[in-house]
Amino acid sequence: MVRHPVSRPVDVLHLGRDRVICAYEIDGVIVDPGPASCVETLIDRLGPVEPRVLLLTHIHLDHAGATGVLCRRYPKLKVYVHEVGAPHLVDPSKLLKSAGRLYGDAMWELWGEVAPVPEERITTLSGGE
């Protein structure tokens, strides 16, 4: 019998509220870790699971904002993201400028530190991968 991994939802309690932002964990792969403002909750709720891979569906801060902080915390963590989003992970300045115009003074509370991701940690995906 073939065993298929089962995804586990991990509610990161954005702004202390449940069912707002949810990451998913599948055998140490974290799909969309959420914002950096929730990284401690994510880590606590993962329990003994140490993330080995982040798989990002896209780079919006509610899905991928914690990526740089998690890479700093877990030195072997690998990141998979579409090729269009990868440059914004390496240098998030344009993303932060755009988000700052939208969220203003609430930026830090909503999203936390958006840290750059070392380029060598990123594997880009394209097309239908």
Model-derived features: positions:
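Conserved beta-strand hairpin/beta-sheet module of binuclear metal-dependent hydrolase folds
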Residues: M1-V49
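General small-molecule cofactor/ligand-binding pocket signal
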Residues: D11, Y80, I122-L125
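Residues at the C-termini of beta-strands that transition into short coil/loop
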Residues: H14-G16, E83, S126
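Active-site metal-binding loops of divalent metal-dependent hydrolases
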Residues: P33-P35, I59, V84-G85, G128-E129
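Short alpha-helical
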Residues: S37, L61-D62, P87, K94
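Active-site metal-binding motif and surrounding structural segment of the metallo-beta-lactamase
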Residues: E40-V81
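A short, structured active-site edge motif that brings together acidic residues
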Residues: Y80-P87, P92
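Metallo-beta-lactamase
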Residues: L89-E129
